[in-house]
Amino acid sequence: MTKEESIEIQGIVLDTLANAVFRVELENGHIVTAHISGKMRKNYIRILTGDKVTVELTPYDLKKGRITFRSR
């Protein structure tokens, strides 16, 4: 999948699940489960409940996503 096909949207982390998976509420009110991208995992970026994040969604499954950026 190319980058042009993915959907990027802002959200807030609601809950931390096992294996670096998070429950994120998007700007439009939907709640999705998202995992950390490989570069964030490699650089030990910590994500806590309440953090603002950028989530990348695929058009095939809008309930799962990848966290690509944590806002300050």
Curated annotation (Swiss-Prot):
Biological role stated in the UniProt entry: One of the essential components for the initiation of protein synthesis. Stabilizes the binding of IF-2 and IF-3 on the 30S subunit to which N-formylmethionyl-tRNA(fMet) subsequently binds. Helps modulate mRNA selection, yielding the 30S pre-initiation complex (PIC). Upon addition of the 50S ribosomal subunit IF-1, IF-2 and IF-3 are released leaving the mature 70S translation initiation complex.
Domain S1-like: 1-72
Protein name: Translation initiation factor IF-1
Any one GO cellular component localisation term in the record: cytosol
Family per record: Belongs to the IF-1 family.
UniProt KW keywords: Cytoplasm, Initiation factor, Protein biosynthesis, RNA-binding, rRNA-binding
Assembly with partners or alone: Component of the 30S ribosomal translation pre-initiation complex which assembles on the 30S ribosome in the order IF-2 and IF-3, IF-1 and N-formylmethionyl-tRNA(fMet); mRNA recruitment can occur at any time during PIC assembly.
Entry's localization field: Cytoplasm
SUPFAM superfamilies, A to Z: Nucleic acid-binding proteins
Xref: InterPro entries: NA-bd_OB-fold, RNA-binding_domain_S1_IF1, S1_domain, TIF_IF1
PROSITE patterns membership: S1_IF1_TYPE
Molecular function in Gene Ontology: ribosome binding; rRNA binding; translation initiation factor activity
Pfam families: eIF-1a
Gene name tied to this protein: infA
Organism: Baumannia cicadellinicola subsp. Homalodisca coagulata
